[in-house]
Amino acid sequence: MDVETKIKKMGLGHEQGFGAPCLKCKEKCEGFELHFWRKICRNCKCGQEEHDILLSNEEDRKVGRLFEDTKYSTLIAKLKSDGIPMYKRNVMILTNPVPAKKNVSINTVTYEWAPPVQNQALARQYMQMLPKEKQPVAGSEGAQYRKKQLAKQLPAHDQDPTKCHELSPKEVKEMEQFVKKYKNEALGVGDVKLPREVVDQGPNQMYIPGGDRSTSAAVGAMENKSHEHRRTHYACYCCKMNMKEGDPAIYAERAGYDKLWHPACFVCSICYELLVDMIYFWKNEKLYCGRHYCDSEKPRCAGCDELIFSNEYTQAENQNWHLKHFCCFDCDNVLAGEIYVMVNDKPVCKPCYVKNHAVVCQGCHNAIDPEVQRVTYNNFSWHASTECFLCSCCSKCLIGQKFMPVEGMVFCSVKCKKMMS
């Protein structure tokens, strides 16, 4: 597919998940409606991952595309209908042991994902070593956690130009080169093994200086001794705690045979969340989720959440922005050269701030302009003026004076307070 065709196919899938309820805002949100370039709901401003959207096939396509043209292509299957790679995630159904009684239904547990190992007992152990609220049991809090992390850690717009907003042909080409590079140099999938299996399959790094045929017996003895030592001492690369020989460990090929992790310790070094489906990115001796690996390589637009491939972009409030995306979070008007106020780390233009976010003066009951000085005590505010910050009894100006606050009112003295009580 050429660049021009890819640009024509670009779209954010606005019909996807339309009307889905927000898990965070509940009934306050009218239902999911994707903003035309931000990756958030237009109604409640929460992200797509905060909504109860059925995305199983879409997520499997996304991960399938990630593994395409990599050594992990065995984890995908291409549909005959459209040739789109689909992630063959391993679903595990476990039957819990129950006493042999008549008329007793079999109790089964379905995991929406499980490590693809032949030893089901090892997979069961792996799941039990995860925090219960993060075990991806179908219909549980853990399954919702996995779904949210798939969206957060592996954004489709970090690998697919057609999921981005109005990229130029040059930006599409740069993005494709970037994706190819991280697939070749950083992408990996963890493997669940027993600690001794990982260490035993690693290359023997022991070196005996001056060795010859006459020392073969001694070398063999030393190798055996070293082998025994390695089989009884295993430490987690993350927490540094000892690992039990019979417990499952995670091995990451790009990290090397000398590094192992507890299942609950196989986390991103930035957000410290479990690496979803054990998909990791390795850089500078650290594990990253897809999002934070990309953040370490490219600036990310705080407006649209996409990586920036343009040479020109804006930096403001310790964040990066596409030139066209440095906009008011409420009305989307461009803020270049305009006065704005940061509200929850989002820029808001002055009119929207006064209308939607400004605190109300207890004196005149009008919104307080962001550029105007004010007096604040607990949850109450006043214009810092002789007309507003006054004694609620005698109207004496209290600027620079001691005062007594009582339920939104202020008094200059005990006498005035008693007169109003």
Swiss-Prot record:
Protein name: Testin
Notes on the domains: The N-terminal and the C-terminal halves of the protein can associate with each other, thereby hindering interactions with ZYX.
Record keywords: Cell junction, Cytoplasm, LIM domain, Metal-binding, Repeat, Zinc
Family, per entry: Belongs to the prickle / espinas / testin family.
SS bond list: none
Main subcellular localisation: cytoplasm
Location(s) in or outside the cell: Cytoplasm; Cell junction, Focal adhesion
Organism field: Otolemur garnettii
Domain PET: 92-199
GO CC list: cytoplasm; focal adhesion
InterPro entries the record matches: LIM1_Testin (IPR034958), LIM2_Testin (IPR034959), LIM3_Testin (IPR034960), PET_domain (IPR010442), PET_testin (IPR033724), Pk/Esn/Tes (IPR047120), Znf_LIM (IPR001781)
Subunit record text: Interacts via LIM domain 1 with ZYX. Interacts (via LIM domain 3) with ENAH and VASP. Interacts with ALKBH4, talin, actin, alpha-actinin, GRIP1 and PXN. Interacts (via LIM domain 2) with ACTL7A (via N-terminus). Heterodimer with ACTL7A; the heterodimer interacts with ENAH to form a heterotrimer.
Superkingdom of origin organism: Eukaryota
Domain LIM zinc-binding: 234-297, 299-359, 362-421
PANTHER family documented for this protein: LIM DOMAIN-CONTAINING PROTEIN, TESTIN
Keyword Cytoplasm listed: yes
Function: Scaffold protein that may play a role in cell adhesion, cell spreading and in the reorganization of the actin cytoskeleton. Plays a role in the regulation of cell proliferation. May act as a tumor suppressor.
